[in-house]
Each structure stands twice: as C-alpha cells, then as structure tokens.
Amino acid sequence: MMFRLTSVSCFLLVIACLNLFQVVLTSRCFPPGIYCTPYLPCCWGICCGTCRNVCHLRFGKRATFQE
C-alpha cells in the first residue's frame, strides 16, 4: 500500500513539474533587436519585425517622389 501511494504521488509531482515548465517556456519574451512575431512577443517595446522601442515607418518610391 505504501509503494502505491508513493508511486502515485511521484506521478502527480512529475505532472505538476511538466505543467510548470510549460508555463515558463511559453511565457518567454525577447529583448530588443531580436526577431519577433505576435506569437513570440517582445519583453518591452514594440514588435516591428524585430523588437524595438519605436517602429519607424518605411515609405516607398511614391511617397518620396518630389516635383
């Protein structure tokens, strides 16, 4: 009886540890300068392809055309 109780408690402990590791690994974030997506967020700042403090707008040829 003692063996069964110990093995069940060890099994439950392993499940709890795996859930804890899953939460830690899925909630990580990336520092500035690292590639990011909406599913891989920045720790701080904004995701503009890479983690940055401010997104700079990039204009095409039509926007820079001068008469």
From Swiss-Prot:
<keyword id="KW-0528">Neurotoxin</keyword>
<keyword id="KW-1015">Disulfide bond</keyword>
<feature type="modified residue" description="Phenylalanine amide">
    <location>
        <position position="59"/>
    </location>
</feature>
<feature type="propeptide">
    <location>
        <begin position="63"/>
        <end position="67"/>
    </location>
</feature>
<feature type="disulfide bond">
    <location>
        <begin position="47"/>
        <end position="55"/>
    </location>
</feature>
<feature type="disulfide bond">
    <location>
        <begin position="36"/>
        <end position="48"/>
    </location>
</feature>
<dbReference type="InterPro" id="IPR013141">
    <property type="entry name" value="Conotoxin-I_CS"/>
</dbReference>
<feature type="disulfide bond">
    <location>
        <begin position="29"/>
        <end position="43"/>
    </location>
</feature>
<keyword id="KW-0732">Signal</keyword>
<keyword id="KW-0632">Potassium channel impairing toxin</keyword>
<keyword id="KW-0964">Secreted</keyword>
<keyword id="KW-1220">Voltage-gated potassium channel impairing toxin</keyword>
<dbReference type="InterPro" id="IPR020242">
    <property type="entry name" value="Conotoxin_I2"/>
</dbReference>
<dbReference type="GO" id="GO:0005576">
    <property type="term" value="C:extracellular region"/>
</dbReference>
<keyword id="KW-0872">Ion channel impairing toxin</keyword>
<dbReference type="GO" id="GO:0090729">
    <property type="term" value="F:toxin activity"/>
</dbReference>
<comment type="similarity">
    <text>Belongs to the conotoxin I2 superfamily.</text>
</comment>
<keyword id="KW-0027">Amidation</keyword>
<feature type="disulfide bond">
    <location>
        <begin position="42"/>
        <end position="51"/>
    </location>
</feature>
<keyword id="KW-0800">Toxin</keyword>
<protein>
    <recommendedName>
        <fullName>Kappa-conotoxin-like Em11.8</fullName>
    </recommendedName>
</protein>
<dbReference type="GO" id="GO:0015459">
    <property type="term" value="F:potassium channel regulator activity"/>
</dbReference>
<keyword id="KW-0165">Cleavage on pair of basic residues</keyword>
<feature type="signal peptide">
    <location>
        <begin position="1"/>
        <end position="26"/>
    </location>
</feature>
<dbReference type="Pfam" id="PF17557">
    <property type="entry name" value="Conotoxin_I2"/>
</dbReference>
<comment type="function">
    <text>Inhibits the vertebrate voltage-gated potassium channels Kv1.1/KCNA1 and Kv1.3/KCNA3.</text>
</comment>
